[in-house]
């Protein structure tokens, strides 16, 4: 069959849309890259001889025919009879976004980048003289729909359409049958975007609007453009680097004009979504592409961009900065990157199809402006190590904190306020050794000096805050003690102030006098840590029992709670003993022996001190949440034991024992009982014990100051230490009984059970020696 017969439509069959059309008139209508068409009609007039193009571009024609055969675009006999000129590649790729009729929107919404298999163009093979000639021919001769010639389907089942009617859109990010990604949404064409950017929407087929002669890319104005962004357009890029999965494209005319100023840029792959230029929301603008510098035509909203080369655009250091983006609400946002930026005063719209790189920035500075929209001086809030632009960045959450109150902005600049450790109110200073407010300071002083017996109406776990701190004085007082408030801390503070004042007075002396004296003032010797000061530091804190006061009291439950509290206090006493200066120099067996013999002495003496300081010796203050009142004393087995312990608290109250005296006496009670055979390091033990006896004498002198009364007080205090033996022995006897008598069902903690089990044989055999100050 004659090949011309194949090109004629069958009789009686209407023209099939989507098929290439040929007639006997001069010229051929050619369709190339069927999967990459945007509704563009291309006509090759007879004045352009195909034989010449075929001779000069034989290698290009063969390469192009292979591509058509691979993609199923060749028709039966079409490749042999209709040779393809070289200008097809240039028109298909380069003018796909610009060509069309002058009275019709040329860009359809389904323009798509073909994949690598669909484009077979090598660098250096583009002829721009043919391209300009084809543009001139297209302007002179445009195809009308009624002049198109129809043919039926070819034997290969391939259909083509050369009509100028737009194709159905797939939407942005969609794909057609050839898996190519569309550039624009279906409700937007190229000229709509160019009109938004301020570019004239006239048809690029106009001779005055030739894209290759556009003054925007003149050599003179290349300096006014942002040089990295000038080459960001894929139509003006060099051919050294393109994105992975695509071949290079070289447009020599464009690169000659920008060769001195343009740098290489990575072209995004076809399957990556194209970033939107800008997104206008309620009263602010989101910049989605770093290559867009836009000046709005309405209102006080504006943006100015300063850019310099980044890793994508050359070897320069990355620096992107967008300053002064203000909104009608008065907010201002500031994005700042490295300092090596090039300011640009000529704000021209630059359309960049390349999406931003994966890492362009290293920091993010955000500032807020208040007042008027035009004259707001932003302050910087730095967020280091945070990327500004990324692939598909849409600026989420910018408006979440856009309107800070004046109080918030003022307080954020200064240090955070200090809070009271008791009620979490704003602290007024350090009172009684703890950072508290004035209200808790006064409350604690009155509670201690007034000797109030506070009881919690709940479960000793009331919430103490700024609003509810007056609801429960017992829990508030317990929290004060837990925080570490102590009336003795006030005296220590006064001592420190006296030392500082004496040091300041010495420093203010005349230079002549200070030169003759030693460089170390006399007050420095008082700053040397003493044994008393060290004992103050290592003193254990007050522990809580966790006793539930809401449940009716029983002897079994109350004693079990006291034993559990005693076990924890023994653990605390072991840590305290190891921190005593000189105690760890003893043999390890001696340390364990002294603790096993003296644990009850330490517990009772500390209980008497707490009862004396908190209740003036009227009731037993085991813990802030466990106080033995008169009602609890009348329980079985409680009356006699509590009366013995109250005697110790009463003696302390009558003698008005100071804190320094209490600390020294407590260490002496640790060393008041030893085995009959003595200790392994007995000499060292005697030396340490005598050292703390002398410290007790120093504490007495420090308190009294009169030598005639010092010995009397020393006698009274040592008599109190001797009386502790009788009280401790009676309590130990009852403790051993309750431990051995399982019918009482009194619980003991593990550590306390171990100590009692080891101590019972020693006491029963009488293998102990009391170290008394006075003979009976």
Curated annotation (Swiss-Prot):
Keyword check for Ubl conjugation: no
Gene Ontology biological process terms, A to Z: cellular response to glucocorticoid stimulus; cellular response to steroid hormone stimulus; chromatin organization; nuclear receptor-mediated steroid hormone signaling pathway; positive regulation of transcription by RNA polymerase II; regulation of transcription by RNA polymerase II
Pfam families per record: GCR, Hormone_recep, zf-C4
Residue stretches of biased makeup (Low complexity): 403-413
Gene Ontology MF annotations: DNA-binding transcription factor activity; estrogen response element binding; nuclear glucocorticoid receptor activity; nuclear receptor activity; steroid binding; steroid hormone binding; zinc ion binding
Chain intervals for the UniProt region annotation (Hinge): 486-522
Region named Modulating: 1-419
This protein's UniProt keywords: Chromatin regulator, Cytoplasm, Cytoskeleton, DNA-binding, Lipid-binding, Metal-binding, Mitochondrion, Nucleus, Receptor, Steroid-binding, Transcription, Transcription regulation, Zinc, Zinc-finger
Domain NR LBD: 523-757
DNA-binding region as annotated in the record: 420-485
Biased composition (Polar residues): 47-83
GO cellular component: centrosome; chromatin; cytoplasm; mitochondrion; nuclear speck; nucleus; spindle
Subcellular location: Cytoplasm; Nucleus; Mitochondrion; Cytoplasm, Cytoskeleton, Spindle
Tissue specificity field: Expressed in liver with relative abundance.
Matches recorded under InterPro entries: Glcrtcd_rcpt (IPR001409), NHR-like_dom_sf (IPR035500), Nucl_hrmn_rcpt_lig-bd (IPR000536), Nuclear_hormone_rcpt_NR3 (IPR050200), Nuclear_hrmn_rcpt (IPR001723), Znf_hrmn_rcpt (IPR001628), Znf_NHR/GATA (IPR013088)
Known role: Receptor for glucocorticoids (GC). Has a dual mode of action: as a transcription factor that binds to glucocorticoid response elements (GRE), both for nuclear and mitochondrial DNA, and as a modulator of other transcription factors. Affects inflammatory responses, cellular proliferation and differentiation in target tissues. Involved in chromatin remodeling. Plays a role in rapid mRNA degradation by binding to the 5' UTR of target mRNAs and interacting with PNRC2 in a ligand-dependent manner which recruits the RNA helicase UPF1 and the mRNA-decapping enzyme DCP1A, leading to RNA decay.
Record text about domains: Composed of three domains: a modulating N-terminal domain, a DNA-binding domain and a C-terminal ligand-binding domain. The ligand-binding domain is required for correct chromosome segregation during mitosis although ligand binding is not required.
Subunit structure: Heteromultimeric cytoplasmic complex with HSP90. Upon ligand binding the complex undergoes a conformation change and moves to the nucleus, where it dissociates. Binds to DNA as a homodimer, and as heterodimer with NR3C2. Interaction with numerous other transcription factors modulates transcription activation.
Family note: Belongs to the nuclear hormone receptor family. NR3 subfamily.
Protein name (Swiss-Prot/TrEMBL): Glucocorticoid receptor
Organism expressing this protein natively: Xenopus laevis (African clawed frog)
Organism placement in taxonomy: Eukaryota, Metazoa, Chordata, Craniata, Vertebrata
Name of the gene this protein is made from: nr3c1
């Amino acid at each position: 069959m004659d090949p011309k017969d194949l090109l004629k439509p069958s009789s009686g069959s209407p023209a099939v849309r989507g098929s290439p059309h040929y007639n006997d008139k001069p010229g051929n209508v050619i369709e190339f890259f069927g999967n990459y068409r945007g509704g563009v009609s291309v006509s090759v007039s007879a004045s352009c001889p195909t034989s010449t193009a075929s001779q000069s571009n034989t290698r290009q024609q063969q390469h192009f025919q292979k591509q058509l055969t691979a993609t199923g675009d060749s028709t039966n006999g079409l490749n042999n009879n209709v040779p393809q000129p070289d200008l097809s590649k240039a028109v298909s790729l380069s003018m796909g976004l610009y060509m069309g009729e002058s009275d019709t929107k040329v860009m359809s919404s389904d323009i798509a980048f073909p994949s690598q298999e669909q484009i077979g163009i090598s660098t250096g093979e583009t002829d721009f003289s043919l391209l300009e000639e084809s543009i001139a021919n297209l302007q002179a001769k445009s195809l009308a729909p009624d002049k198109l010639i129809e043919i039926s389907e070819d034997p290969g089942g391939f259909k083509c359409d050369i009509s100028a009617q737009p194709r159905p859109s797939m939407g942005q990010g969609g794909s057609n049958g050839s898996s190519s990604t569309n550039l624009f949404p279906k409700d937007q064409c190229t000229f709509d975007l160019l009109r938004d950017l301020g570019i004239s929407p006239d048809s690029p087929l106009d001779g005055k609007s030739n894209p290759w002669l556009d003054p925007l890319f003149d050599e003179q104005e290349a300096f006014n453009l942002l040089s990295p962004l000038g080459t960001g357009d894929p139509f003006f890029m060099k051919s050294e680097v393109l994105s992975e999965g695509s071949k290079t494209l070289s447009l020599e005319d464009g690169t000659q004009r920008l060769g001195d100023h343009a740098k290489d840029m990575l072209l995004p792959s076809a399957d990556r979504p194209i970033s939107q230029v800008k997104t206008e929301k309620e009263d602010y603008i989101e910049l989605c592409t770093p290559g867009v510098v836009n000046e709005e035509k309405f209102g006080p909203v504006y943006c100015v961009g300063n850019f310099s080369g980044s890793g994508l655009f050359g070897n320069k250091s990355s620096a992107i900065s967008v300053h002064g983006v203000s909104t009608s609400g008065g907010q201002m946002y500031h994005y700042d990157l490295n300092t090596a930026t090039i300011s640009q005063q000529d704000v021209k719209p630059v359309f960049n199809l390349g999406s931003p790189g994966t890492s362009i920035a290293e920091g993010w500075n955000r500032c807020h402006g208040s007042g008027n929209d035009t004259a707001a001086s932003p302050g910087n809030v730095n967020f280091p190590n945070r990327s500004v632009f990324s692939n598909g960045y849409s600026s989420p959450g910018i408006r979440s904190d856009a309107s800070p109150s004046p109080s918030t902005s003022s307080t954020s600049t200064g240090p955070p306020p200090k809070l009271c450790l008791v009620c979490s109110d704003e602290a007024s200073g350090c009172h009684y050794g703890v950072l508290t407010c004035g209200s808790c300071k006064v409350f604690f002083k009155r509670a201690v000096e007034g000797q109030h017996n506070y009881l919690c109406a709940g479960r000793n776990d009331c919430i103490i805050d700024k609003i509810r701190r007056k609801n429960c004085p017992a829990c508030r007082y317990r929290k004060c003690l837990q925080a570490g408030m102590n009336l003795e801390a006030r005296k220590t503070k006064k001592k420190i102030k006296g030392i500082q004042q004496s040091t300041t007075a010495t420093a203010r002396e005349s230079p002549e006098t200070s030169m003759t004296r030693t460089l170390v003032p006399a007050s420095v010797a008082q700053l040397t840590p003493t044994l008393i000061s060290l004992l103050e530091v290592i003193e254990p804190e007050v522990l809580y029992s966790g006793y539930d006061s809401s449940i009716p009291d029983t002897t079994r439950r109350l004693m079990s709670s006291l034993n559990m509290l005693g076990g924890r206090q023994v653990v605390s006493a072991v840590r305290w003993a190891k921190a005593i200066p000189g105690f760890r120099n003893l043999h390890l067996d001696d340390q364990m022996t002294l603790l096993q013999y003296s644990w009850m002495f330490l517990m009772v003496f500390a209980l008497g001190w707490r009862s004396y300081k908190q209740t003036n010796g009227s009731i037993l203050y085991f813990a802030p949440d466990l106080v033995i009142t008169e009602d609890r004393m009348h329980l079985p087995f409680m009356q006699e034991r509590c009366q013995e312990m109250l005697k110790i608290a009463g003696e302390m109250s009558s003698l008005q024992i100071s804190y320094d005296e209490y600390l020294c006496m407590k260490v002496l009670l640790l060393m008041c009982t030893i085995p009959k055979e003595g200790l392994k390091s007995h000499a060292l033990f005697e030396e340490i014990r005598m050292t703390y006896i002398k410290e007790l004498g120093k504490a007495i002198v420090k308190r009294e100051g009169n030598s005639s009364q010092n010995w009397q007080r020393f006698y009274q205090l040592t008599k109190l230490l001797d009386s502790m033996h009788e009280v401790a022995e009676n309590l130990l006897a009852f403790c051993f009984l309750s431990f051995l008598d399982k019918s009482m069902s009194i619980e003991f903690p593990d550590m306390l059970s171990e100590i009692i089990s080891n101590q019972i044989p020693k006491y029963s055999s009488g293998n102990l020696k009391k170290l008394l100050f006075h003979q009976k």
